[in-house]
Amino acid sequence: MMICLVFLCVLTLARGEIYPPICPAPGVGNDEAVRAGELLLEISAYRNQRSGRVELWGSAAVNNQVFYGGMENSQIDYDFGKFLVFRCFQVFNNVHKLLFNTVSSATMHLARKRVQKCGHGKMTFISIQVQCSVNKKSIRLSRMSEASLKKQVLRVAFFLDRNNNSWIADKNFQGEDRTMLRLWNELSTYQQYLISSCNNDVKILSELYGEFRQIALPYDEKLNLNFMPVIRSSSERLFRADDLKCSFSRWLGAEGEFAVCEYSGWGVSRLGKIEIFAEKPLTFDMAWKTVKMRSSGAYTSLFRDDVTWGLIPLDKWVGDKYFCMCTNKESGDNVIVTLPEKNVEKSIQIYDEGSAMLSFAEMTSIILNLMFMGAVAVSVGILGISCFVGLKEIIYFIFVSVDYMWPFCDTLLTTAVNCFFKGRTFLRRELKI
């Protein structure tokens, strides 16, 4: 079905302009979220500010919990949403080349002019969504626009009427948009194909999920796709003066308690980085160590923003203290958010290579202190015993023991006795010096 939609875009682009006449507005998403049991696949075309070329951006979501968004060159990870997007891009990569290589030179020149005009960041020109569930099937075509200094979304959607299997158009934009109307007129001729494709998406999803489990299970023994956790508590901090947010939440699911660190805001899915740390006991001290987590990132209409998140089960860690660090990889700035109901000291030492060297130095210092205290204790013990048996007997016992255990120390003992005990014939006779 998605292939059909993109091919229709090819036909439309060959006949006329498909990009908006003015630059789109960033950070604008759709109002509806995907409910449990629904599948959403989305493909968007936008301009990459650094490379200057038009690229595809895809996102996938299942049950409002597993999601991912990425570029054409996104690599698969053990996240189901990433897997869906990866499989989609295997198809869309070829379609994308066809989309921009089969149009006339005049149309392509016009498209490039529109791309060059919008040079203030990552902007979405056109977005196609396919949403399928048992009770609802819809296809949306969205375009971003700015009018009268007010950010708006031009959106048209077809909703499937289950009574007679016909599509109902729901127009939601100001003014006429001939390109949009022409595209939806083309889509209306493929009603039966779209209906059958949407009905088959659930079967395809099941097959992909089965294939995905074979890949993912070696990484995650207990992969639970359909968990519906309940949030218990959350803490969050704004990231400097930007509209970025770093939050750390405690959740309770069917299999126990877990924590989710979420870094959200425009651009964090590409420039953001999150790390979760737990306090782990070392030999002589406590230190902070990185926790292995399940993570994902997305720009998706579900959250209307970029999101990067990480999840850890709390029952696998003995430590009571956790914190999440959100870092902007471009500027290097970061903020730290502690897990609710747990107090973390102001001075946090992260257990990495540098802290490992510090811990080794601390351990060496502790060992030297223990050796010094042991020497003092032995000296005090010798003085105490000498009060009862006499100093001569103690010194005699020590020298005889050393001479017996280490015979090679004869020369050293001879020198020591001659220097310090010249008049002590008792020691000289017993040691045969």
Swiss-Prot record:
Record has Methyltransferase as a keyword: no
Localization per Swiss-Prot or TrEMBL: Host endoplasmic reticulum membrane; Host lysosome membrane
Keywords carried by this UniProt record: Glycoprotein, Host endoplasmic reticulum, Host lysosome, Host membrane, Host-virus interaction, Inhibition of host innate immune response by virus, Membrane, Transmembrane, Transmembrane helix, Viral immunoevasion
Its membrane topology: Single-pass membrane protein; Single-pass type I membrane protein
A GO cellular component entry from the record: membrane
Record topological domains on the Lumenal side: 1-364
Residues listed as glycosylation sites in the UniProt record: 164
Keyword Glycoprotein: yes
TM regions (residue ranges): 365-385
Domain of life per record: Viruses
Record remark: domains: The ER-lumenal domain associates with class I MHC molecules and is responsible for lysosomal sorting.
Described purpose of this protein according to its UniProt entry: Plays a role in escape from immune detection by associating with and diverting properly folded class I MHC molecules to an endolysosomal compartment, effectively removing them from the cell surface. In consequence, surface class I molecules are down-regulated and infected cells are masked for immune recognition by cytotoxic T lymphocytes. Also plays a role in the down-regulation of the host stress-induced NKG2D ligand UBPL3, which enables immune cells expressing the NKG2D receptor to recognize and annihilate infected cells prior to viral spread.
Family: Belongs to the herpesviruses U21 family.
Protein name per Swiss-Prot or TrEMBL: Glycoprotein U21
Species name: Human herpesvirus 6A (strain Uganda-1102)
Taxonomic path: Viruses, Duplodnaviria, Heunggongvirae, Peploviricota, Herviviricetes
